[in-house]
């Protein structure tokens, strides 16, 4: 039997089954207990953080094969991987391949951002059924696809219908672009890259055509009613995130952020879980401000950022430009990092791009956990360092974030098994590796005794005499 089947059986049909609902009534759910063990934290702390809104456990009651996880400042920094088909590329099997690779290389959640080229319901259902990690979606994509791309035919009910369909299928969190208001649109004037959010762009077009307020904002309470029946979490979308350094931290971005804070509180009144999405493209000196501002405006709801990229001049290497910003954002308190692949701004990622992007972001998240002094975060680093000093090559590979890549690079020049016991690699060769110089603690203790008995002046004189 699938693990969560018995957990959720008694909840089905209730008006509110969210983790926040139970936490606020001091009920520790099976999901909270599972997360507590995973994070090595007390169950009571998990319950308190979920109740407070500083942590979410995205766990739709219809996603039965899910292994619950937590997103929040009290837990380890998480990484999301985006996959999804486009009208020009990919199919269901390709997306499942990307999913399996993402999970293999440590994705904590996966978003299906399919926009076309496949049956969207088919690919989403296949991904959810195959995924042990939470699945997120952006429902406005399918809402537009359902009316064949015709903004003028897209109604408020179309949005709500698709949102509930995703909940029924088992989606654990949905990006809802409810913070973009019609009065925010003029603030985009003067930007270099305008609106770069696909979902935000769709809603901006809808508002410009209909001259009405954002339907996801006006119907927000209706969406909350849907979400709490399935325990689907909000990922409040940042439609006005900056798409370049020039636009970072501008009036448009901050106006939307203020609205996202208000929506966070509205969702919490329904006991619905919320995280808030963030930029984007941000210079390094503005990253701390962006994280602190989100925490202030959104009352410490978990922050989920895309990057941010710290420079705009490296197409093909944006997994690197963004991992730099992601590590900093994680250090300052961001709860989840959305990966960027080398294909960002250039094309649809293939499976190898997924691997490259994910490893870059696992590095960033791990570095953030170390910088935040999270308990045990550095244990694996220390263990690998001991293996490195002992020339235990197989142990080094095993402890690596990407064992296959580490082994592959080592074996390019020294492939034979005998070199797995060698006290060198091809960088220094057999005679020049500094780690071969095994200076023991006993050696250093003896040196300390000599230094203390002779004194600095005598040691320096001895050195000069030797040089002469």
From Swiss-Prot:
It holds the Pfam family ThiC_Rad_SAM. [4Fe-4S] cluster binds at residues 425, 428, 433. Its cofactor is [4Fe-4S] cluster. Its EC number is 4.1.99.17. Zn(2+) binds at residues 281, 345. One of its GO terms (biological process) is thiamine biosynthetic process. One of its GO terms (molecular function) is 4 iron, 4 sulfur cluster binding. This is Phosphomethylpyrimidine synthase. It comes from Prochlorococcus marinus (strain SARG / CCMP1375 / SS120).
């Amino acid at each position: 039997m699938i693990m969560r089947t018995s957990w959720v059986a008694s909840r089905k049909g209730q008006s509110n089954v969210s983790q926040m609902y139970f936490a606020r009534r001091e009920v520790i759910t099976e999901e909270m207990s599972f997360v507590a063990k995973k994070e090595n934290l007390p169950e009571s702390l998990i319950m308190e953080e979920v109740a407070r809104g500083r942590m979410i456990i995205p766990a739709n009651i219809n996603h039965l094969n899910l292994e619950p996880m937590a997103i929040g400042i009290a837990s380890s920094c998480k990484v999301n991987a985006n996959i999804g088909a486009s009208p020009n590329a990919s199919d269901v099997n390709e997306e499942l391949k990307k999913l399996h690779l993402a999970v293999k290389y440590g994705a904590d959640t996966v978003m299906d951002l399919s926009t076309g080229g496949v049956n969207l319901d088919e690919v989403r259902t296949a991904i959810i059924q195959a995924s042990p990690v939470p699945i997120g979606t952006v429902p406005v994509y399918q809402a537009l696809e359902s009316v064949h791309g015709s903004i003028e035919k897209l109604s408020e009910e179309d949005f709500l219908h698709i949102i509930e369909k995703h909940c029924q299928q088992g989606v654990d969190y949905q990006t809802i672009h409810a913070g973009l208001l019609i009065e925010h649109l003029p603030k985009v004037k003067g930007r270099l890259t305008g609106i770069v959010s696909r979902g935000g762009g769709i809603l901006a077009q809808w508002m410009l055509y209909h001259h009405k307020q954002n339907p996801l904002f006006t119907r927000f309470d209706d969406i909350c009613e849907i979400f709490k029946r399935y325990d689907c979490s909000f990922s409040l979308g940042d439609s006005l995130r900056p798409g370049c350094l020039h636009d970072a931290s501008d009036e448009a971005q901050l106006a939307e952020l203020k609205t996202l804070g208000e929506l966070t509180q509205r969702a919490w009144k329904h006991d619905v879980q919320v995280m808030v999405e963030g930029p984007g493209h941000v210079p390094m000196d503005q990253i701390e401000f962006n994280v602190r501002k989100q925490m202030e405006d959104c009352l410490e709801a978990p922050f989920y950022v895309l990057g941010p990229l710290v420079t705009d001049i490296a197409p093909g290497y944006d997994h690197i430009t963004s991992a730099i910003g992601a590590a900093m954002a994680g250090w300052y308190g961001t709860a989840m990092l959305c990966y960027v692949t080398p294909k960002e701004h250039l094309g649809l990622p293939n499976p190898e791009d997924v691997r490259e992007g994910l490893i870059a972001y696992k590095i960033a998240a791990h570095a953030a956990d170390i910088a935040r002094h999270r308990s045990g975060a550095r244990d694996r680093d220390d263990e690998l360092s001991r293996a490195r000093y002992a020339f235990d090559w197989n142990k080094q590979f095993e402890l690596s974030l990407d064992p296959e890549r580490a082994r592959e690079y080592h074996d390019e020049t020294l492939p034979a098994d005998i070199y797995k016991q060698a006290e060198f690699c091809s960088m220094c060769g057999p005679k020049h590796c500094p780690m071969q110089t095994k200076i023991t603690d006993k050696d250093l203790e003896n040196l300390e005794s000599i230094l203390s008995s002779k004194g600095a002046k005598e040691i320096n004189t001895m050195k000069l005499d030797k040089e002469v």
